[in-house]
């Protein structure tokens, strides 16, 4: 099966005053955080790339992303679509494996 070049998944950003922004991928059972929105988005992309690479390497099923309109959010939460370009992730991971 051909691997996808790009994945796009919803992430839920949770805002609590005085705390980092929590980021959860409901479809992937994965979470991260960031000091601000920019940092949270970068962390989310990095996490998404790692999770998807792991699923591909394990030949695990890739879950379908939940449509944004199906997410149930609290007042302090926002849904954000996060994308990752996998060819660069795969290259970086294979280079990392060779260098070890």
Predicted segments with their positions:
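Short acidic, gly/pro-rich beta-turn/loop elements at beta-sheet edges
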Residues: 21, 33, 92-94
């Amino acid at each position: 099966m051909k691997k996808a070049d790009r994945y796009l998944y919803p992430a839920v950003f949770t805002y609590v005053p005085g705390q980092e922004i929590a980021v959860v991928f409901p479809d992937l059972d994965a979470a991260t955080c960031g000091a601000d929105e920019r940092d949270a988005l970068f962390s989310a992309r990095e996490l998404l790339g790692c999770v998807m690479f792991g699923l591909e390497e394990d030949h695990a099923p890739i879950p379908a992303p939940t449509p944004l309109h199906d997410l149930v959010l609290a007042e302090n939460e926002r849904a954000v679509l996060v994308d990752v370009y996998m060819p660069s992730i795969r290259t970086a991971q294979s280079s990392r494996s060779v260098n070890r």
